Amino acid sequence: MTERFNDRLADVIRRPLITEKATSALEQNQYTFEVDHRAAKPDIKAAVEQLFDVRVVGISTMNPPRRSRRVGRFTGKRAQVKKAIVRLAEGNTIQLFPES
C-alpha cells in the first residue's frame, strides 16, 4: 500500500458504479467502483477488504482520458474518473442494495 492513503482508506473508493454492464458482472462476483485517480491497486485492495470485510482475488483498473464538454460557447473538461473492477473470492459478497 502506498503512503498516500495510509490513514484514510475510505477516501480511495468514491462510489459504486451501477450500470447495465456492472450489474451483469455481479453474477461473476465482480464489483465496479469509481476510485480516486491517484489510487494504486494495492490501495484499492486494502480499502475494499477493510471497508467491506471481504477477500479480494483480483483488480482491474481503467483510467480513460478526460473528454471535452461544451455548453453553449464555453468548453471545459469532464472530471478525471478512474474505474476499478474488483473480483471477490468465492462466497464473499458486498451488499450494494439495502434489503427492504
UniProtKB/Swiss-Prot annotation:
> Which InterPro entries does the entry link to?
Nucleotide-bd_a/b_plait_sf, Ribosomal_uL23-like, Ribosomal_uL23/eL15/eS24_sf, Ribosomal_uL23_CS
Taxonomy, superkingdom: Bacteria
An example of a Pfam family matching this protein is: Ribosomal_L23
Q: Please give one Gene Ontology molecular function term for this protein.
A: rRNA binding
GO biological process: one example: translation
Q: Which UniProt keywords apply?
A: Ribonucleoprotein, Ribosomal protein, RNA-binding, rRNA-binding
**Does the keyword RNA-binding belong to this entry?**
yes
The cellular component terms of Gene Ontology attached to this UniProt record, alphabetical and capped at eight, are: ribonucleoprotein complex; ribosome
Q: What does this protein do?
A: One of the early assembly proteins it binds 23S rRNA. One of the proteins that surrounds the polypeptide exit tunnel on the outside of the ribosome. Forms the main docking site for trigger factor binding to the ribosome.
The record's note on quaternary structure and interaction partners says: Part of the 50S ribosomal subunit. Contacts protein L29, and trigger factor when it is bound to the ribosome.
> Which family does this protein fall into?
Belongs to the universal ribosomal protein uL23 family.
This protein is called Large ribosomal subunit protein uL23
Species this protein is from:
Prochlorococcus marinus (strain MIT 9313)
User: Which lineage?
Assistant: Bacteria, Bacillati, Cyanobacteriota, Cyanophyceae, Synechococcales
